[in-house]
Amino acid sequence: MSLKGRHLIDPNQLSLAELDNIITLGLEIYRNPNHYREICKGKILGTLFYEPSTRTRLSFESAMLRMGGTVLGFSDANTSSAKKGESIADTIRVLDDYADLLVMRHPREGAPLLASQYATVPIVNGGDGGHQHPTQTLTDLITIHHNKGKIENLKVAFCGDLLFGRTVHSLLKTLSRFPNMEFVFISPSELKIPKHLKDEVIKSNNVEIVETTFLEKHMSEIDILYMTRIQKERFFNEEEYVKLKDSYILDLQKLRNAKEDLLIMHPLPRVNEIHPEVDTDTRAKYFEQAKLGVYVRMALMALQLGVIESC
């Protein structure tokens, strides 16, 4: 099914075949970027970032510029009419006429879905509260495929803030749809994966899940370690954050029993949960992950805008 004109609010809107198409095209663009330098000439991307972002916003902007398009938008709600009380619906009704595609990040869960109800151009969810982050999921999938050559028969460990981590929630729900996946959840008891999400994944996909508070317990078994930071901005209590912020710090000592082809990933930004000494380990792929995010977003937007039909 064509992605032309379609919104992307939740990665589960995409079939496995569509996910494969986006990833395949993203890797093709990554290998041959010059072939795609002007495919979006005359196209405008609108960025609506009501919440701080470095990688997601700049990755989208870089992606559009690398395809010959242009970008307009805001990176702080305080510099937009939202500060004056303008509704999301009214903002979308206006910007819908200014751009060919809109990407929105918002602290409120469901805001991009609401926006999509008023837009005639494609809306992409750039992250909504602790809910979903579909293009980070695409970034994660292209990184896994690029390094493992497959997305199946893998044991994936998620570590850190599994309660509020929208990148974890999006990726978990999507990976659980692929064949023969196993998951390990590593977190403090205060930041465990939401029960409804765990139950949904188990019930709908019959996957094997293990929960633990110990980072090293399953290190020798896992194929992918997905680290996340403890998110200070999600806490209402400073004391609780201070108590939990150093729960997990990955260093070379903790990797001593890990597989030689372990894939260490992180959606970034990193605080202190991965020691800098790990950066030079060949298994550390989080900076490559951020780089590949540009190319998978190029692929997504090209397909949504209809400048490419499929790979």
UniProtKB/Swiss-Prot annotation:
Its EC number is 2.1.3.2. Pathway: Pyrimidine metabolism; UMP biosynthesis via de novo pathway; (S)-dihydroorotate from bicarbonate: step 2/3. It catalyses: carbamoyl phosphate + L-aspartate = N-carbamoyl-L-aspartate + phosphate + H(+). GO terms for biological process: 'de novo' pyrimidine nucleobase biosynthetic process; 'de novo' UMP biosynthetic process; amino acid metabolic process. Belongs to the aspartate/ornithine carbamoyltransferase superfamily. ATCase family. Catalyzes the condensation of carbamoyl phosphate and aspartate to form carbamoyl aspartate and inorganic phosphate, the committed step in the de novo pyrimidine nucleotide biosynthesis pathway. This is Aspartate carbamoyltransferase catalytic subunit. It comes from Alkaliphilus metalliredigens (strain QYMF). The lineage of its organism: Bacteria, Bacillati, Bacillota, Clostridia, Peptostreptococcales.
